[in-house]
């Protein structure tokens, strides 16, 4: 790896919000647990990981809403069986292709591309374990600093 590439890769670590400071859901959480955590943090989307710490996907409010609508009888929200929020796990409603992660070795160019499409970018280590996120805000702040 050339020196310039190595510097670019290392720079993304400075943007990383570590897993310990990031809200996430486990894929075996119930829908109720997921919704409560999202409401508590005020998020509209949140990373999902398995119990081994591997990043799976990102789940959004829309994923919950579409499940509830599909689960209701003929789309009538007054007929939604709320007990299904207690029985259904996150892994039963997720779509694996949302917000793909980047490796910690990703370049800033890759981050910019992803940041244009995603509010946050999940970051994984060499083994696919979730290590944190880079928010669009952090990315923009970093570039604003270097603009001057």
Residue ranges and their predicted role:
Residues 1-148:
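Tandem CBS (Cystathionine beta-synthase) repeat/Bateman regulatory domains
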């Amino acid at each position: 790896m050339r020196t310039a590439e190595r510097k670019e890769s290392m720079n993304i670590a400075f943007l990383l919000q570590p897993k310990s400071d990031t809200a996430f859901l486990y894929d075996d959480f119930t829908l109720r647990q997921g919704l409560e955590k999202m409401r508590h943090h005020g998020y509209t989307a949140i990373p999902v990981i398995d119990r081994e710490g591997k990043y799976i996907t990102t789940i959004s409010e829309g994923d919950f809403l579409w499940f509830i609508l599909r689960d209701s009888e003929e789309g009538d929200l007054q007929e939604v069986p709320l007990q299904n929020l207690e029985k259904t796990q996150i892994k039963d409603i997720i779509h694996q292709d949302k917000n793909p992660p980047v490796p910690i070795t990703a370049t800033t160019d890759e981050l910019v591309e992803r940041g244009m499409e995603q509010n946050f970018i999940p970051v994984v280590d060499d083994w696919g374990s979730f290590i944190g996120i880079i928010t669009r805000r952090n990315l923009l702040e970093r570039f604003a600093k270097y603009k001057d």
